[in-house]
Amino acid sequence: MKILVTVILFGFLLSFSLKRFNNAKMENVSINMNQTKTPVYFVDEKDIKDLVKQFNPTKKIGDVKIPELEKKINEIPFVDSANVYMNLNGNLNVDIKQRIPIFRLNKNGKDFYVDEKGVEFPISRNFSYPCMLVMGDVDASEYQELGQLVEKIDKDDFSKKYFIGIKKEKNNYNLL
């Protein structure tokens, strides 16, 4: 009998505290962007905070739909991965790893970046990342090998200063 009363009392207290926690205001939004050798500013904290406000206009902890918010942040083309979580103090934490371009590709008159995984993503209106320009009709299957070549050029001080781009013409690559 004592065990039953204890379990019921514990359940009541737990449900009361959970309701109180869900109705509490979100204290803070902490955004952690990945740090790299060359800073990346495709997405900034203001963009993410605006997105959080859209997903939680009431600012109540219980109204935050963390999986949906995380999915929406991951849909941003400049974001490689995002992790959204709430701690017990009512702070929403957002960890973001931005895509880092290996090269900028000009293909059929359109410009876009390609990251180390071979993923294409658009040019930003807010930020231009310093990377090698590649021109020509480059197939997506060639991105990995081309990325490795660009990385080798970037690591060599002489090559980095001497070559400013790569151009593909008639299935041949020419260093510019």
Residue ranges and their predicted role:
Residues 1-75, 80-176:
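Charged, solvent-exposed interaction patches on well-folded alpha/beta domains
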